[in-house]
């Protein structure tokens, strides 16, 4: 049957990538259809019940700054919040939250069902409709044909997914759900370059069977026994408009236990039946979230590993033991769980398993995540070789935006590595590809001092507003914050403190020593031991500003002060990094000719020519980041392009040098 209504964008898959893609495309005014195998699993957290972390929290904040759903859904469902790296610099601080799975799903579904211009439909997709080299729709398993101008594939682990428990294995997209075998076969027919990856999940435990007295309690921030008592963090920049931490449901602690030598002996006894070691699993697993058997094998000298016991939600006793992801046979899982302190009588509710699945080489994508071979077909999420909810959500928003922009006839949105972690993620994928599931870290961003969690809105919300992603409510909150930060920064720079008018004892109290000469408040705030609150208390509060008070700004006051303080204390570093950004931008403006025959660039080594021919970078900057391409090779390529006088290149080069 040909469905009578046509759409602009079809999104296939309703996990973290698909939901953000569909919401973004609809917010940009495109008629959007979200196809899913089950409406009951919209936004499902397939593995751990948490959002955020180092690098990952930065992506969540960026999705939020662009009007995405993940951060607000986490605030509405989060049962524990923590700021990681709190004692370190602002560039690497990150928010992490435990979420109630059911509340999170409900929050996502509510947003999907209430988004204008977005339709939901429950059916698996088995085929894509093509006209020449362009996708024009999707076909479901019962033959319903949906037509559209763009299709975004966010199939997660469902493409030819196979679950492994010991020597047993069966086809599945995740536990209890069928894999997308037909769609995977269709993509292989299109000769898109692909491979196999794997991920895994631990056995789930009934919390009533755990002896919590034998475990170490780990309270969240703001909880009794945690840091910042009474001040629970929030994820979304909009949370302040909805009551801040009052949005959160009841807060719960996590708990910690440990593996031991007996645990490790049990695990080793199952190596001969582990699909990892018998060769049953072809896919490569995530380096930074290894299975427990992989940890015991690789780190044989370690006698113990931490295991975090994380509650799955308020309405269930189910517990997620973070740290023992495994595909070992169930009898080994049973023994290894019961070998740990507090878990001696643990009842396993669900066995752990590994799942391997198809992914497609992201180097075959254009900069906007459109496939090079099929026009109008976009990929996002684990299909691109990434791991993690946050990486998926960010890619989904990016692909959904660019699919919608293409339908509108607008230029693609391509954030740079200096603008967003999303830009780093996209650039890493399309230039370097993946050999293992890709996970975001702050260390991947060379300009991370500019790409902090706290300023994601200052970097991206105006961009989102121009595209149409950001609604009036978010824009009003952002504008108040932005304007207050600008006003207060200028006031601090323009307000001077004269030592003749300040008693030495008062100067010593706030500044640590008497002032030698006149300083602006901004200069004083740059000192390591001076904070904003202390500075505003100087001389009886003489220099405090009502505009930045909690009475004036409400809950926004804290984030405004944070921005002002970071701008002052890191001014020198930020300016230096801006210079690095400007130097790096030179190569990013030099677009390589689409039809350039690298085989004719004889000054390059054969290897370099082969690598560039395979990758087809779009700019000289992208080319410089490809593995195996040296600075010398870039210089030789630049000389070739100059001598060849390629159309558009010389003018761009001249502009860049001017």
Curated annotation (Swiss-Prot):
A GO-annotated cellular component: cytosol
Cellular localisation: Cytoplasm
The keyword Mitochondrion belongs to this UniProt entry's keyword annotation: no
Alphabetical UniProt keywords: Cytoplasm, FAD, Flavoprotein, NAD, tRNA processing
Entry's Gene Ontology molecular function annotations: flavin adenine dinucleotide binding
Highest taxon, organism lineage: Bacteria
PROSITE patterns linked: GIDA_1 (PS01280), GIDA_2 (PS01281)
InterPro entries noted in UniProt: FAD/NAD-bd_sf, GIDA_C_N, MnmG, MnmG-rel, MnmG-rel_CS, MnmG_C, MnmG_C_subdom, MnmG_C_subdom_sf
Amino-acid positions noted as binding NAD(+) in the UniProt annotation, renumbered to this chain: 285-299
Cofactors named for this entry: FAD
Annotated residues for binding of FAD: 13-18
GO biological process: tRNA methylation; tRNA wobble uridine modification
Gene3D superfamilies noted in UniProt: FAD/NAD(P)-binding domain (3.50.50.60), GidA associated domain, C-terminal subdomain (1.10.150.570), tRNA uridine 5-carboxymethylaminomethyl modification enzyme MnmG/GidA (1.10.10.1800)
Function: NAD-binding protein involved in the addition of a carboxymethylaminomethyl (cmnm) group at the wobble position (U34) of certain tRNAs, forming tRNA-cmnm(5)s(2)U34.
Family to which this protein belongs: Belongs to the MnmG family.
Subunit structure: Homodimer. Heterotetramer of two MnmE and two MnmG subunits.
Name this polypeptide is given: tRNA uridine 5-carboxymethylaminomethyl modification enzyme MnmG
Gene name of the record: mnmG
């Amino acid at each position: 049957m040909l469905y009578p209504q046509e759409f602009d964008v079809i999104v296939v898959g309703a996990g973290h990538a698909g939901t953000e893609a569909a919401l973004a495309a609809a917010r940009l005014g495109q008629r959007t259809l979200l196809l899913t195998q089950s409406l009951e699993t919209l936004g499902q957290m397939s593995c751990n019940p948490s959002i955020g972390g180092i690098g990952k929290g930065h992506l969540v904040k960026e999705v939020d700054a662009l009007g995405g759903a993940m951060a607000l859904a986490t605030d509405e469902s989060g049962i524990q919040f923590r700021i990681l790296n709190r004692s370190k610099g602002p560039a690497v601080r990150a928010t992490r939250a435990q979420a109630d799975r059911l509340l999170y799903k409900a929050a996502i579904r509510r947003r999907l069902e209430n988004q204008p211009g977005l339709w939901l439909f429950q059916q698996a997709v088995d085929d894509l409709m093509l006209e020449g080299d362009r996708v024009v729709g999707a076909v479901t398993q019962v033959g319903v044909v949906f037509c559209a101008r763009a299709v975004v594939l966010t199939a997660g682990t469902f493409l030819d997914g196979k679950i492994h428990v010991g020597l047993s294995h069966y086809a599945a997209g995740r536990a209890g759900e069928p894999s997308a075998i037909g769609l995977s076969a269709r993509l292989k027919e299109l000769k898109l370059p692909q491979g196999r990856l794997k991920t895994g999940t631990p056995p789930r435990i009934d919390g009533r069977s755990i002896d919590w007295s034998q475990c170490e309690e780990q309270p969240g921030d703001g909880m009794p026994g945690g840091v910042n008592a009474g001040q629970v963090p929030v994820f979304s920049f909009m949370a302040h408009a909805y009551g801040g931490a009052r949005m959160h449901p009841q807060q719960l602690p996590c708990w910690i236990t440990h593996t031991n030598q007996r645990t490790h002996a049990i695990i080793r006894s199952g190596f001969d039946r582990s699909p990892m070691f018998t060769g049953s699993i072809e896919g490569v697993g995530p380096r930074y979230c290894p299975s427990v058997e992989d940890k015991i094998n690789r780190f044989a000298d370690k006698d113990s590993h931490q295991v975090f016991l994380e509650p799955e939600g308020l309405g269930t006793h189910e517990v997620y033991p973070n740290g023992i992801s495994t595909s070992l046979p169930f009898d080994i899982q049973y023994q290894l769980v019961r070998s740990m302190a507090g878990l001696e009588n643990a009842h396993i509710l669900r066995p752990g398993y590994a799942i391997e699945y198809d992914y497609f080489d992201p180097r075959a994508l254009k900069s906007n995540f459109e496939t090079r071979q099929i026009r109008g077909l976009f990929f996002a999420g684990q299909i691109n070789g990434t791991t993690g909810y946050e990486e998926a959500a960010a890619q989904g928003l990016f692909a959904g935006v660019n699919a919608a922009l293409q339908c509108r006839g607008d230029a693609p949105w391509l954030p740079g590595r200096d603008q967003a972690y999303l830009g780093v993620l996209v650039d890493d994928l399309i230039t370097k590809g993946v050999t293992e599931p890709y996970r975001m870290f702050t260390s991947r961003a060379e300009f991370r001092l500019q790409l902090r969690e706290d300023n994601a809105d200052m970097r991206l919300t105006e961009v989102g507003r121009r595209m149409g992603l950001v609604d009036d409510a978010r824009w009003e909150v952002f504008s108040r914050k932005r304007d207050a930060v600008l006003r207060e920064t200028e006031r601090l720079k323009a307000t001077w403190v004269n030592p003749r008018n300040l008693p030495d004892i008062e100067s010593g109290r706030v500044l640590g020593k008497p002032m030698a000469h006149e300083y602006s408040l901004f200069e004083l705030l740059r000192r390591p031991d001076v904070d904003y609150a202390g500075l505003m208390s100087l001389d009886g509060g003489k220099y405090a500003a009502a505009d930045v008070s909690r009475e004036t700004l409400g809950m926004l006051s804290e984030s405004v002060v944070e921005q002002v303080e970071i701008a002052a204390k890191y001014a020198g570093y930020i300016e230096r990094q801006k210079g690095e950004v400007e130097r790096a931008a030179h190569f990013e403006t030099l677009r390589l000719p689409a039809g350039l025959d690298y085989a004719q660039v004889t000054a390059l080594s054969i290897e370099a020519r082969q690598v560039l021919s395979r990758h087809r970078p779009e700019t000289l900057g992208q080319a410089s980041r490809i593995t195996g391409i040296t600075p010398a090779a870039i210089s030789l390529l630049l000389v070739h392009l100059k001598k060849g006088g390629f159309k558009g290149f010389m003018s761009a080069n001249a502009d860049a040098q001017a």
